[in-house]
């Protein structure tokens, strides 16, 4: 979405714009600089998929500090975290260590996620066995122009596409187990069915694995399904 436009609308309405920045991550987007008052981000990719539980970071814009409106933003963040069953500021030493190690390699890993997502999106866009490939880095995406001014270092790690005459569950079952069981934010590309296994939509989060191998594995599974 156009965060600048949403930020302006929020200010005019005297509202707080809250952004879930998990997919793009702080590496790929800075909502606070674009007009958000509060940014929330699950730290799966920061921790390279190794966190023992869900960790979420909440960031408040400096403008909120200057206006002494921290309370409203902080209360909003606290309510959202509590509603997700998450507690604040209670990291164990192991969790802190995983987070620290993840931050040391974050930029390199995130760039790899983004680059591989783009490569896989381009492969899928040229694949006649799928349709409606959705990735903001493709010029065919309706938000491509907006995304170029909102996102940084690429266009994020996520790609969605639809299958033709096959269900998401069929494709996922035809792929090696690691494509569905690998931890979120980890090194292995992960596929899921956001509209259920009986739907046709696949969501792919690129890992740091070889995109050529991932594309070949997907291609083989799609071709096998086409012969059934």
How would you describe each model-predicted region?
Residues 66-68, 169, 214:
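Short acidic, gly/pro-rich beta-turn/loop elements at beta-sheet edges
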Residues 101-102, 110-111, 118-196:
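Conserved small-domain helix->loop->beta segment predominantly found in fold-type I
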Residues 5, 109, 166-167, 174, ...:
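PLP-dependent enzyme catalytic core of the Aspartate aminotransferase-like
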Residues 53, 96, 154-158, 199-203:
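Short, solvent-exposed beta-strand edge segments and adjacent coil->beta transition regions
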Residues 59, 160-162, 205-207:
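Short hydrophobic/aromatic beta-strand micro-patches
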Residues 32, 63, 138, 164-166, ...:
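Generic structural motif
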Residues 1-129, 134, 140:
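Conserved PLP-enzyme active-site core in the AAT-like
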């Amino acid at each position: 979405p156009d965060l600048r436009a949403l930020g302006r609308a929020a200010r005019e309405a005297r509202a707080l714009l809250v952004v879930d920045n998990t997919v793009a991550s702080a590496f790929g987007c800075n909502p606070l600089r674009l007009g958000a008052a509060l940014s929330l981000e699950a730290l799966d990719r920061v921790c390279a998929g190794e966190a023992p539980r869900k960790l979420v970071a909440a960031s408040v814009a400096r403008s909120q500090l200057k206006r002494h409106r921290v309370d409203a933003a902080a209360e909003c963040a606290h309510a959202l975290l509590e509603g997700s069953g998450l507690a604040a500021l209670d990291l164990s030493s192991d969790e802190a260590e995983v987070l620290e190690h993840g931050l040391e390699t974050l930029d390199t890993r995130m760039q790899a996620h983004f680059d591989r997502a783009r490569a896989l999106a381009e492969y899928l866009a040229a694949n006649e066995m799928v349709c409606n490939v959705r990735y903001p880095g493709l010029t065919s995406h309706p938000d491509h122009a907006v995304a170029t001014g909102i996102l940084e270092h690429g266009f994020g790690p996520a790609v969605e596409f639809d299958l033709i005459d096959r269900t998401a569950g069929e494709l996922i079952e035809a792929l090696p187990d690691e494509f569905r069981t690998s931890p979120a934010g980890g090194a292995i590309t992960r596929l899921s069915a956001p509209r259920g296994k009986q739907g046709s939509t696949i969501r792919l989060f690129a890992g740091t694995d070889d995109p050529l191998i991932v594309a070949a594995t997907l291609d083989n599974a799609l071709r096998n399904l086409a012969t059934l």
